[in-house]
Design a protein with these regions (language model features):
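Accessory terminal and edge-of-domain segments that mediate assembly/interaction
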Residues: 1-106, 112-254
Length: 254
């Protein structure tokens, strides 16, 4: 039933059925239950080629076609896909993957830091501030999305087993890459946000509506900690291969 509001983004219909569903094409495609859905530039394609992954399908958007791979990892089939940047396209592709069989998903990607955190550090978001538009189409309006305990536990157990330090954080998910104003950054920091990215709250909302497990392993890139001296650093590039390796271990552990 739709909840009407003067501001359209705050309207919500809790009916999970839509006129156009993710599997409306009726493709002959059955994906594995486990999936890595990663924001890692070309790392997914590189790794898929390296290990001889099977390309089992494609997600076709208006601007790009995304291959969907299946690999055999320690005797278990795992789906592997590169996620597009931004809450709307990332949610659309993940919803499509779920529509064709995916049930347990781990994402990874970079985040900007609002606090004094070194580059290439691993972080586990446990709460996301919903400053993007997509999540409001999947879950009723609220200020935050809470991450699922099952996913958090799997991520942290693997990090601890490998002796990799990490922090639990609240993240600020925004659509406005060029609208992170000084006053807004300060406000988010006061509220407890340690990092900023563009998809976390939206993907958590997709998972909640569809009844699947999703979690994310973030690693640090640029820094907004000093409002007078923005530092792009090296965009977390040194952690890409390590992040993918960890995600494989995490999703296998689930």
């Amino acid at each position: 039933m739709i909840q009407k509001h003067a501001i359209p983004i705050l309207e919500f219909d809790d009916n999970p059925q839509a006129v156009l569903m993710p599997n409306h094409e009726g493709l002959d495609l059955k994906l594995p239950k486990k999936c890595i859905y990663a924001f890692l530039e070309e790392e997914i394609d590189r790794y898929a080629q390296e290990v001889g992954a099977d390309c089992v399908g494609e997600f076709v958007s208006a601007t790009k076609t995304y291959p969907v791979y299946v690999i055999n990892y320690k005797g278990e089939k795992i789906c592997l896909a590169q996620a597009p940047v931004g809450s709307a396209p990332a949610a659309q592709f993940m919803d499509w993957l779920i529509g064709y069989g995916v049930e347990q998903i781990i994402s990874t990607g970079t985040c900007g830091v609002l606090a004094d955190i070194e580059e290439n550090a691993f972080l586990v978001p446990v709460q996301a501030l919903r400053d993007e538009g997509t999540s409001y189409h999947y879950v009723a309006p609220s200020r935050y999305m809470e991450m699922q305990i099952e996913a958090i536990s799997a991520i942290e157990q693997v990090l601890e087993q490998r002796g990799i330090p990490y922090e639990e954080v609240m993240t600020w998910t925004t659509d406005g890459f060029y609208r992170e104003t000084a006053e807004k950054v300060a406000y988010r920091k006061e509220e407890g946000c340690a990092v900023v990215e563009m998809e976390c709250s939206a993907l958590a909302a997709v998972a909640q509506l569809r009844g699947v497990v999703w979690g994310e392993l973030l690693f640090t890139a640029d820094s907004l900690a000093d409002l007078d001296n923005y530092d792009s650093r090296d965009w977390g590039s040194e952690a890409f291969d390590k992040a993918l390796e960890l995600c494989l271990a995490i999703v296998h552990h689930m």
